[in-house]
């Protein structure tokens, strides 16, 4: 393991020195660095994941070491995640490498551009900050105004209800990351709030929402009013 650790540290030191040189010459420069994609080939076949010196684990260790020593002005792009999205057999192109030293396929270029542009955009504040949600058949199964509290489905022992609860948990995690939550629903407000107040399995609570609009006005008008209250349309997702 000591020999592998030495190789990994030596490999990472090259990048660490490069970051340092960039930061010295360009003050306040934000560096975007792509992490290694773990190769899809396995030099030891099915045993590759069992040994620290395998090719795949070597690149995993490099990625982890880079992350462990990341300066504050360096942001990593997890290309291994994006390679998994499209499939690593589609990500790599050996013929492209031998012809022009391009290790990735043309299929992967779109994913790379998308991932990189999104990360850079978020750094400059170009990201969605407010999520507008409907209620019926969105946060629970059924229609609260027709089915009542007992009739809507957010039952953790029911497959459909479990899916709604999982969705609510994900929305809750977005709030924890700083996303503003709002409700826009065609409903009677007092009825629409009942599940949040009385259903024991609701993950989301009324206090999780910065704005709660439930009425019979058209949704476009309601969303426009929410946008005015929360600094414009560009920050919205729904």
What do the predicted segments below correspond to?
Residues 104-111, 162-163, 167, 176:
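Extended, H/D-rich, highly charged conserved domains that either
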Residues 182, 194-211, 226:
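Hydrophobic, small-residue-rich alpha-helical packing segments that form membrane-like cores
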Residues 185, 212-216:
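Conserved beta-strand/loop elements of the cytosolic catalytic core of P-type E1-E2 ATPases, chiefly
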Residues 144-169:
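Basic, amphipathic juxtamembrane/active-site segments
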Residues 223-238:
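Conserved Lys-Pro-Asp/Glu-containing loop-to-beta segment of HAD-superfamily phosphomonoesterases
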Residues 217-221:
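Short acidic loop-to-helix transition motifs that present clustered carboxylates
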Residues 1-133, 139-140, 145-151, 202:
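Extracellular glycan-modifying ectodomains
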Residues 166-197:
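Substrate-recognition element of Asp-dependent hydrolases with the DxDx(T/V) motif
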